[in-house]
From Swiss-Prot:
Keywords for this protein: Antimicrobial, Cleavage on pair of basic residues, Secreted, Signal
UniProt keyword Secreted, yes or no: yes
Known role: Probable antimicrobial peptide. Shows low inhibitory activity against herpes simplex virus type 1 (HSV-1).
GO CC terms of this entry: extracellular region
Main localization of the protein described in the UniProt heading: secreted
Subcellular location: Secreted
Protein known as: Antimicrobial peptide Eval162
Tissue specificity as recorded in UniProt: Expressed by the venom gland.
Amino acid sequence: MKFSALLPVFFLLLVVGDEVQAIAKTALKVLPQLFKRSVVRKREIEEAFDLHQRDLDFDKLLSQLDFN
């Protein structure tokens, strides 16, 4: 009787173990790509802001030099 009760538990452990392994493999492939994309996006945003800030600083400098 114990064997018949343990058999479904053992089968479920195999199925769940395979699912966990598949999820872990997928996560190991997907997560680094997500982080890479976010870092790239962050750099792009920072570069765009820096260019915009430089333009603003240059315009401010020109307005200060304008004596009219």
